[in-house]
């Protein structure tokens, strides 16, 4: 019997570290790691030791004999992956290496981490592993740690939601203090933190929706608001009565757009009158040949009680494609039969339609696209992606991320590094990648801090004792 990694794999790579057979691929050192949706266990090498099951923080690994009918897809994907992988690389050694520690110093290193989401958690954990005397203060504007992991991940992704428990050990360490309900940039400035700490790490994520059309148009909603409301509704056994019906239009083509469609299909998001939405259209800028969502997100949507249509504009399905999404498209086209089941929610995916205008007409919303199409709906959900909120004293690039080179914050004017200021997570690389991607991202940023720290601490301007560094208490406060 072998084990299979499912689609909600977080790519934390903890499983790779504990596997005695080195049979989990790709590793973080391999080029495919950045592009695969999830990791794979070689069915010809797995010895059923279950070490990976215990190590997986997302609960995404199961014995193949325990897979449900819909999960068998991942066993097939695993076989396909290793069939295409060169034999020489299937069982090669895994080179993880030991992280470089902070050099010894005459006083503890003081760091501020801005934000308390997944990127911050992995950063704090990485920092604690590099020094026994380090002192870390985490500043968070909300009342709880966890960020979008706590508020926006669907209840159907319970394995991912359970990753909140990873905060427990690092954030309760005696070397870590948390300061909740503090807005950096408003309650305390970046400049003040730079004066008080040796290093400031920006981990505030990207939770601001990218703008489309006219702001505050009646019937417009942000995806993050709806998903958070849906989670609250599930927690309280109710429904999120937010939309105008009967038709909803979701603008955006990533996993978040499909998450909103799934929440509507599950009737967690309904009309203000409590009625289910009767029709959903997802309007994506990406092409049907290169959609932005993952195969797992699409597969999850197809498992719901919906009637899914892929609007292809006459283009035939790519039957021979190696891309898993295109394969699923082809399977859906082959299996599709005319339906008269009015109980199923009609969901149509439109591709190649970038929004050019959006306005209110007669109480409804009209949307026009680059493909010369016009869509009309009662509610529109903006799921076009996220950007970081600007913070005074932090340089931002045009794409909405903090100006940086591999975690070192740089001046956009000169390109020079700003000593003592670093960034991690979505604020560093943009709003893409899952929870576990932050682990490698955090390690890269901390590597830069370790490399720079002696130069930073030799700066006489940073030699004063920090008010934040005195009387340092552990735990959440």
Model-inferred region functions:
Residues 109-133, 257-266:
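N-terminal Rossmann-like FAD-binding beta1-loop-alpha1 element of flavoenzymes
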Residues 183-200, 358-374:
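Conserved beta-strand-loop-beta-strand element in the redox core of flavoprotein oxidoreductases
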Residues 408-477:
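C-terminal, flexible cofactor-proximal segment of oxidoreductases
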Residues 53-112, 122, 129, 155:
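Flanking helices and flexible, charged tails adjoining ferredoxin-like Fe-S electron-transfer domains
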Residues 14-34, 38, 51-69:
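Iron-sulfur cluster-binding cysteine motifs and their immediate structural context
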Residues 16, 33, 218-238, 242-244, ...:
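FAD-site-proximal beta/loop scaffold in flavoenzymes
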Residues 135-138, 145, 151-152, 160-163, ...:
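Dinucleotide-binding/catalytic capping subdomain of oxidoreductase cores
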Residues 75-102, 209-274, 398-414:
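Glycine-rich dinucleotide-binding loop and its adjacent helix/turn
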